[in-house]
């Protein structure tokens, strides 16, 4: 009993608050209905009076308070989807149905910003990764302009690029002319810049998983990159072309540079000259041979352009050796005696030195036509090999001199004298008169020996003549008129030294050293041998024959020497043709050694001034050709990669379009199926409704029939049917037979029971 009371009390206590809450809720609904009516009247009155519509928030007294909480959940999402269009007078419309122009109307004030557009779409509830936003064209919710909704990522790209056609594309600089120095780097920097700018823009869409947005941006950048024009010839537009100068000017120019470099290097490399390197030639009588003295002075000037330091490079010896001295090693098998004869004619052979590229001297008369030059052989890097070569050559020279002295002892009769053209400059230089004797027998023996050597050396010398023939013509044409006196050669040395920075100092030192060596040689002078006389006579005779137009030399006075000239002329020409200038090699005071070690190398480098330039030009052309080939290959690869990229992008785009078309078609079929299903469902529902109505009618008729059976149990069936309206024509027929009654009864039963089934 107590438990029942407790239960009833709990029910009463729980039911009372519910009733109270329901009553309050109904009262609130009543007040809201009244407020709605008042608001409607307020709006209707303002519209009727053509007044400004009141704001539903401003009209609330709770506006200063938390009015945001007055909006329900559904209306919050609805209100948040509305947006003001600045293009149409701040018209408020649903932004989900706006066109692009109305949606981005706020960018007129703030400027376009893809990040802001993405954020806007995200805040508006767009599913950026959704693929099911394809629909038919519809009108804008603001301006009623028809527009077609696209995929939101594509719309994002359009929204980001609208109003900034120039800024949306990567900043591709104009194609500049590429130089050799910047060919690899400028194009690479430009590509890196494009890739960087493109990646920064793509990352905007790829940070939130928008891979397809980034891909579309990549497509845009690849298109713009393919539009970048680049020609194969652009990389070579500003490459400095080498000036092609004549062979003479180019040779002299390069040689002057070498001369300047030699002078600059003279302070660093100053080899010790051998004491017996140069030998002065004296005749027995009071006169000196002009060509011998001229060669001696020119050699001294050539040597003294590089000051000598006696204590530097003590283990290295330098020696100027003519090609005729190297003949036993170069040309095969001449006699040692002939080589020894030429060894002591070193100064006479050097008289014919041409204006070498480094020394800046002119050709003597005998040198221009006889192609007498000296080759400066560069020393090997290996000092041991160089010292061995010098030692061997020195031993050979000593043996030759011993043989010559032995020959001199056999011929004691000396006759004849050599007369030379007197020169005022040479008379001032020559200190003391030396009078060596010349033997007639010695001259005859030399004539026989030289004639015997001539036959064996002609074939060998022809080989060297072929090498130097072309160079001799260029050198002879390129040089100025030779000098015939020491004063002229000295003036040329002064002119040449004035062109360089340190020319005057070097020339003065060379002049002093030359005078000192003249004193020393005058003190140590020996009688002139027949070999030296032969060289002097040959030089004078060749100078007379070949260069009579430029200068004249005084005829010889000795009959014996004049007899020797025909036999010695050809051999001396050959020896002078083989002789090469050693001033054409690199480096100013380079140490020289015998030409026998590298004879064919020296022959091939006789035109080193031009051959070096040609080799460098060939290397340069080869480098240009290889660079051009590499650029062509690079361009082909780049074009092939660009074409492949474009094809891949086009294929992917085509696949995307096909996929989108298939997706739209599938959506259309699905929508059609849904509509058909809805139509079928409606038809089925209508059929069910009709069936239910028929069944209800049948039930009503059955109930009515039972009612009449109960009410009129004794009444005949005809009356019942007549009263129901089934037999309305019974009075017309007046058929009362039992057979008719039975048929009527059967027909009635059939109508009552068969009509529903027929409809079913």
UniProtKB/Swiss-Prot annotation:
A GO term for molecular function: myosin XI tail binding
Keywords per UniProt: Coiled coil, Membrane, Transmembrane, Transmembrane helix
Keyword field contains Transmembrane: yes
Spans annotated as Disordered: 161-189, 247-273, 292-311, 348-595, 725-760
Protein name (record): Probable myosin-binding protein 4
Function: Membrane-anchored myosin receptors that define a distinct, plant-specific transport vesicle compartment.
A cellular component annotation (GO) from this entry: membrane
Regions crossing the membrane: 26-46
Disulfide bonds: none
Keyword Iron-sulfur: no
GTD-binding domain span: 611-709
Compositional bias annotation for Basic and acidic residues: 371-383, 404-413, 537-550, 562-580
């Amino acid at each position: 009993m107590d438990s029942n009371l407790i239960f009833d009390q709990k029910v009463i206590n729980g039911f009372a608050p519910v009733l109270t809450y329901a009553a309050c809720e109904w009262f609130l609904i009543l007040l809201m209905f009244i407020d709605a009516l008042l608001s409607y009247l307020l709006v209707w009155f303002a519209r009727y009076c053509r007044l400004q519509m009141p704001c539903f928030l401003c009209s609330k007294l709770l506006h200063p308070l938390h009015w945001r909480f007055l909006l329900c959940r559904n209306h919050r999402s609805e209100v948040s989807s509305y947006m003001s269009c600045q293009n149409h007078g701040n018209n408020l419309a649903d932004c989900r149905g706006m066109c692009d122009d109305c949606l981005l109307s706020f960018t007129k004030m703030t400027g376009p910003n893809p990040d802001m557009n993405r954020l806007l779409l995200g805040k508006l509830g767009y599913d950026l990764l959704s693929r099911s936003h394809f629909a038919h064209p519809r009108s804008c919710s603001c301006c009623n302009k028809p527009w077609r909704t696209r995929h939101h990522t594509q719309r994002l790209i359009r929204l980001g690029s609208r109003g900034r056609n120039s800024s949306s594309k990567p900043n591709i600089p104009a194609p500049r002319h590429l130089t050799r120095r910047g060919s690899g780097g400028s194009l690479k920097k430009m590509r890196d810049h494009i890739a960087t700018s493109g990646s920064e823009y793509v990352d905007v869409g790829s940070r939130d998983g928008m891979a397809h947005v980034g891909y579309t941006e990549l497509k845009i950048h690849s298109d713009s990159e393919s539009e970048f024009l680049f020609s194969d010839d652009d990389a070579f537009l500003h490459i400095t072309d080498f000036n092609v100068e004549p062979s003479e000017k180019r040779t002299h120019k390069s040689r002057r540079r070498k001369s300047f470099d030699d002078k600059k290097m003279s302070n660093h490399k100053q080899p010790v000259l051998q004491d017996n390197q140069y030998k002065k030639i004296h005749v027995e009588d009071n006169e000196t041979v002009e060509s011998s003295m001229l060669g001696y002075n020119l050699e001294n000037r050539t040597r003294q352009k590089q000051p000598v330091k006696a204590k530097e490079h003590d283990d290295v010896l330098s020696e100027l050796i003519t090609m005729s001295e190297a003949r036993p090693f170069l040309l095969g098998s001449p006699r040692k005696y002939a080589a020894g004869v030429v060894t002591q004619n070193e100064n006479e052979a050097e008289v014919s030195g041409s204006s070498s590229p480094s020394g800046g001297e002119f050709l003597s008369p005998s040198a221009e036509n006889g192609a007498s030059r000296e080759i400066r052989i560069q020393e090997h890097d290996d000092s041991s090999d160089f010292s061995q070569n010098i030692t061997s050559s020195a031993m050979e020279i000593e043996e030759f001199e011993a043989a010559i002295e032995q020959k001199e002892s056999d011929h004691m009769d000396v006759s004849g004298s050599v007369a030379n053209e007197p020169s005022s400059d040479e008379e001032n230089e020559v200190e003391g008169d030396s009078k060596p004797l010349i033997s007639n027998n010695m001259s005859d023996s030399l004539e026989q020996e030289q004639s015997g050597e001539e036959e064996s050396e002609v074939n060998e010398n022809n080989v060297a003549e072929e090498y130097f023939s072309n160079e001799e013509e260029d050198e002879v044409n390129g040089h100025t008129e030779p000098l015939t006196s020491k004063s002229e050669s000295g003036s040329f040395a002064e002119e040449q030294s004035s062109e360089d920075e340190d020319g005057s100092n070097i020339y003065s030192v060379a002049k002093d050293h030359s005078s000192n060596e003249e004193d020393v040689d005058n003190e140590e002078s020996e009688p002139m041998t027949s070999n030296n006389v032969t060289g002097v006579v040959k030089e004078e005779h060749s100078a007379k024959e070949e260069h009579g137009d430029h200068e004249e030399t005084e005829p010889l006075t000795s009959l014996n020497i004049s007899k020797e000239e025909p036999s010695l002329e050809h051999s001396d020409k050959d020896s002078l043709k083989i002789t090469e200038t050693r001033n054409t090699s690199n480096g100013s005071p380079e140490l020289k050694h015998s030409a026998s070690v590298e004879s064919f190398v020296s022959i091939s480098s006789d035109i080193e001034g031009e051959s070096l330039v040609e080799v460098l030009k060939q290397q340069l052309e080869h480098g240009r050709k290889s660079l051009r080939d590499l650029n062509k290959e690079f361009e082909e690869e780049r074009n092939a990669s660009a074409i492949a990229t474009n094809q891949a992008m086009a294929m992917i785009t085509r696949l995307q379009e096909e996929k989108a078309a298939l997706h739209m078609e599938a959506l259309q079929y699905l929508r059609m199926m849904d509509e058909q299903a809805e139509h079928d469902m409606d038809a089925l529902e209508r059929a069910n409704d009709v069936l239910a109505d028929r069944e209800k009618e049948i039930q009503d008729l059955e109930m009515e029939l039972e009612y009449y059976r109960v009410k009129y149990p004794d009444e005949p069936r005809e009356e019942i049917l007549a009263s129901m309206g089934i037999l309305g024509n019974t009075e017309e027929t007046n058929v009362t037979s039992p057979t008719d009654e039975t048929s009527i009864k059967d027909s009635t039963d059939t109508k009552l029971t068969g009509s529903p089934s027929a409809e079913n």
